[in-house]
Each structure stands twice: as C-alpha cells, then as structure tokens.
Amino acid sequence: MSVPESALIDPRTIRVAQNRPSLQPGFFFACSNVDLPRCEPLMRMYWNISGADAAVSLIGLITEELNHAEEPFDLKVACSRAVFERTDAAVLYLPAAGLARTAATLRRISDVLARTGCLGEGTPMWTLQVARGVGVAEDPGGRVSFGQVRAEQAARAIVNSGASSNPPRRLHEAEREFEAMGVALAAPHRRQGSSWNDEEFLESWSK
C-alpha cells in the first residue's frame, strides 16, 4: 500500500485522521492532538452514555478538555442505537501513568454529564466504579477486550467447580483462577502484575 510522504511521522508510524467514523461499524473514534503512547500500559474508562445526544456531549467535552491540557487519549463512542443499551457504549483510553493527573478533569466531565442526564447508573462488570455510569479498568494489553478476558476466567472457574451447588467452592475456584492469572478477585479491574495505585487515583478523582 502506498502511503503519502506527508502522512509518515517515522518509518514505522503513520499519521491518521483524528476523527474516524468508519473505523469500526457502529462506533465513532476520536484521538487526541498528542500521540497516545502504544508501548505503555493503558487505562480504560467506560462511560454509560444514555443516547446520541449524550454521545455528542461526551465527545465534545473529552476532546476540548483533554486536548486543551495536551493529554493523549483515544475515544471510542457508539453511534448505533442498539449499542447505547450497553454500559460500555463509550470507552476512553489513556496512559496509566497520567490517569491521576487527568482525574480532576474527568471528574468534572462526569459531573456535567450526570447533571444533564447523559449517564446511566450501571458500569461494566469487573470495572472499578468511580461515579455514576463511569467505570475504570486497566487495559489487558494484546488488543483484546477487557470484558472478554475476565469472562473467560470466570467461565473456566465455573467449569472447574463442576456441577457444585456449593457457593464457597465456586468462590474458591474463581479466586484460584484469577490468582493463576496474577489478578486478585477482589480487584478484577487490575491487570496481571499491576502496579497501578488506584487509591491515589480515587483521591485525585475526589478532589
């Protein structure tokens, strides 16, 4: 494939459009003015937006506030009516190292969206809920779905517990399965071998 010379940042990096409405059917993608580092651990922030108007508001607030602060991000927002029924209709990708720095800004955005009825109550399973309709999780890496990874772990635990109707046994199998992957069942929002300080983030979020 021929790439215009103006689109080449270096031999391995291509400059793409910031707004990409056709990258994945049913979703709108926006990226920051600053390149998102792909080799560093990422965080995912899930937004339970209530519909098309909420999607427009979220895109406007995120792009304006984070670009003004020169923070790198990718934003994936549903543009299909069916997807708005999900609690992960919008996902914001950020560097883990900078999450605490952007926490106050993201909290203000969530407050605005909540006041205007743009956020539902629920958040995706396994995430750390930080506000109404807003959940956080560490990106598992490898370009895989966070929810899929956790669901597969839970499924293996169910299979390993067999047909047992004993809740403690099922819980034990779940704990063992998650621990085998280096993840605590009590903190499923963290990735394997995580060093992320979620208490620091929550403190910054609440300021």
Where are these regions (language model features)?
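Structured alpha/beta or helical-core interaction and ligand-binding surfaces enriched in interleaved
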Residues: 1-207
